[in-house]
């Protein structure tokens, strides 16, 4: 029999082993679609971003005008920009759902895969932050000022660090040019780490909703899951295109239609919606360094999750108490997101503080406690 080029060619066999003949559990649900959706989001963002970069000028006097020019005069420039801006939102929606799936089904027990995933999340957050500064509107400028200024809370080296990051004594032209350079570079870093993420995943194979070994019942990725991923893709593209074409500015801030002005501070400085939960945690602590540490902890806490798993069962499928706690955490994150968008006044301050306390309590204390309790209940 003639050798199959798909299995013998040095490059094609890597593709084959990752996307075609990959042995996959037969019972993974639609919650396992988000990995491929994230890959599509990344490719879309890189392509639209590349096209936008061709018309963008990283200079404080021209940045705002160059973005306006792209939308007005470049063929389909408005569409490319709207796809890129809203693509970021969908990227975050997918990554939050992907992480939620990992938490619910105990996927974090594949520690290397989980840790590279957390690094991917941090890199994505950095990319989105520097990207938001590029249009050089009011919220771009003041967002950059507020967030970079947080580094000054680091004892001893803080102020030096901030001025080094700014390239001067305030957010100005050097800041914009380096942010553009970083925004261009980081997506390719994300692509590289994604390959590492997949390499670690394929060492163990996918988890499944039952959390038990699926070695006895595997099916090839293609055609079963390739077709399922295409379905997931079409289902994501419908709301994505609806948003980008009918209300492209729905998730944006009106302040960003005003060019950056260092002399006028917007009444409410707030980041894009996908950072609001972390922003609310930052603001809930009335101390600069404490807030910065809480902000960092809100994401880095994910690295501790594998060590806090106390249950004898991997997934939450048959653990109603943990399920209740999980959905409580989801509701809590929605409350934090809402609080992050509100002004710093009563009653929002206390609500934010309670929600922040709940967030850390649920993850660090209640999940391990409930896991241990469920083990005891199983023994009766």
Curated annotation (Swiss-Prot):
Main location per the UniProt record: mitochondrion
Cellular localisation: Mitochondrion inner membrane
Superkingdom classification of source: Eukaryota
Binding residues for heme b b566: 98, 197
Swiss-Prot/TrEMBL cofactor(s): heme b
Stretches that traverse the bilayer: 34-54, 78-99, 114-134, 179-199, 227-247, 289-309, 321-341, 348-368
Binding site for heme b b562: 84, 183
Stored SUPFAM superfamilies: a domain/subunit of cytochrome bc1 complex (Ubiquinol-cytochrome c reductase), Transmembrane di-heme cytochromes
Iron found in the keyword field: yes
Entry keywords, A to Z: Electron transport, Heme, Iron, Membrane, Metal-binding, Mitochondrion, Mitochondrion inner membrane, Respiratory chain, Transmembrane, Transmembrane helix, Transport, Ubiquinone
Positions that bind a ubiquinone: 202
A single GO BP: mitochondrial electron transport, ubiquinol to cytochrome c
GO MF terms held by the record: metal ion binding; ubiquinol-cytochrome-c reductase activity
Recorded coiled-coil stretches: none
Membrane topology, record value: Multi-pass membrane protein
A GO term from the CC aspect: mitochondrial inner membrane
Pfam families reported for this sequence: Cytochrom_B_C, Cytochrome_B
Cofactor mode of binding and number, as noted: Binds 2 heme b groups non-covalently.
Matches recorded under InterPro entries: Cyt_b/b6_C, Cyt_b/b6_C_sf, Cyt_b/b6_N, Cytb/b6-like_sf, Cytochrome_b, Cytochrome_b_C_euk/bac, Cytochrome_b_N_euk/bac, Di-haem_cyt_TM
UniProt similarity note: Belongs to the cytochrome b family.
Cited function: Component of the ubiquinol-cytochrome c reductase complex (complex III or cytochrome b-c1 complex) that is part of the mitochondrial respiratory chain. The b-c1 complex mediates electron transfer from ubiquinol to cytochrome c. Contributes to the generation of a proton gradient across the mitochondrial membrane that is then used for ATP synthesis.
Miscellaneous comment in the UniProt entry for this protein: Heme 1 (or BL or b562) is low-potential and absorbs at about 562 nm, and heme 2 (or BH or b566) is high-potential and absorbs at about 566 nm.
Assembly with partners or alone: The cytochrome bc1 complex contains 11 subunits: 3 respiratory subunits (MT-CYB, CYC1 and UQCRFS1), 2 core proteins (UQCRC1 and UQCRC2) and 6 low-molecular weight proteins (UQCRH/QCR6, UQCRB/QCR7, UQCRQ/QCR8, UQCR10/QCR9, UQCR11/QCR10 and a cleavage product of UQCRFS1). This cytochrome bc1 complex then forms a dimer.
Protein name as it appears in the record: Cytochrome b
Organism: Alectoris chukar
């Amino acid at each position: 029999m003639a050798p199959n080029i798909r299995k013998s060619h040095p490059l094609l066999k890597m593709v084959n082993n990752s996307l075609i003949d990959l042995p996959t559990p037969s019972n993974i649900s639609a919650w396992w679609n988000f990995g491929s959706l994230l890959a599509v989001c990344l490719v879309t963002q890189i392509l639209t971003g590349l096209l936008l970069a061709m018309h963008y000028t990283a200079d404080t006097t021209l940045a705002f005008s160059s973005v306006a020019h792209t939308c007005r005069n470049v063929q389909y420039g408005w569409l490319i920009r709207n796809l890129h801006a809203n693509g970021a939102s969908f990227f975050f929606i997918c990554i939050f759902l992907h992480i939620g799936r990992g938490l619910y089904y105990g996927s974090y027990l594949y520690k290397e895969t989980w840790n590279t995933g957390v690094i991917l999340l941090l890199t994505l957050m950095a990319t989105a932050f520097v990207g938001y500064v590029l249009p050089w509107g009011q919220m771009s400028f003041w967002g950059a000022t507020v967030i970079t200024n947080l580094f000054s809370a680091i004892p001893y080296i803080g102020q030096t660090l901030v001025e080094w990051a700014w390239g001067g004594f305030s957010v100005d032209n050097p800041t914009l040019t380096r942010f553009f350079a970083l925004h261009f570079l980081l997506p390719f870093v994300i692509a590289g780490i994604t390959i590492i993420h997949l390499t670690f995943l394929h060492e163990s194979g996918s988890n499944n909703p039952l959390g038990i070994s699926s070695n006895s019942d595997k099916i090839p990725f293609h055609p079963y899951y390739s077709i399922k991923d295409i379905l997931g893709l079409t289902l994501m593209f419908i709301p994505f295109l609806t948003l980008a074409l009918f209300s492209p500015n729905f998730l944006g801030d009106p302040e960003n239609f005003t060019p950056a002005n260092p002399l006028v501070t917007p009444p409410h400085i707030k980041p894009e919606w996908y950072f609001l939960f972390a922003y609310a945690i930052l603001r809930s602590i009335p101390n600069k360094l404490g807030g910065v540490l809480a902000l960092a902890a809100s994401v880095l806490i994910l690295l501790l999750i594998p060590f806090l798993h106390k249950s004898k069962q991997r997934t939450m499928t048959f653990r109603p108490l943990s399920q209740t706690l999980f959905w409580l955490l989801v509701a809590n994150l929605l409350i934090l997101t809402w609080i992050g968008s509100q002004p710093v006044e009563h009653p929002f301050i206390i609500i934010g503080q309670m929600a922040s306390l709940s967030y850390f309590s649920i993850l660090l204390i209640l999940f391990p406690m409930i896991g241990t309790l469920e083990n005891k209940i199983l023994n009766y």
